[in-house]
Amino acid sequence: MRSFKFNLGQPVAITASGEVGVVVGRAEYINSSNSYFVRYAAKDGRATEAWWSEDALEAAN
């Protein structure tokens, strides 16, 4: 079992877009990477929530 890279409530950035949000949920799987449910403001201003794989996120400054 892998440990989680990000904590609940931790600010994270979506690597591909630079959008920043907060981890509001986490999921672990046997055969794939950990996933995180992130609440963030999309670049067009919409409030958004989506699942992201661990490798698609980085810690926000």
Could you tell me what each predicted segment is?
Residues R2-N7, P11-N61:
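Basic/aromatic-rich interaction segments and small domains that mediate binding to polyanionic partners
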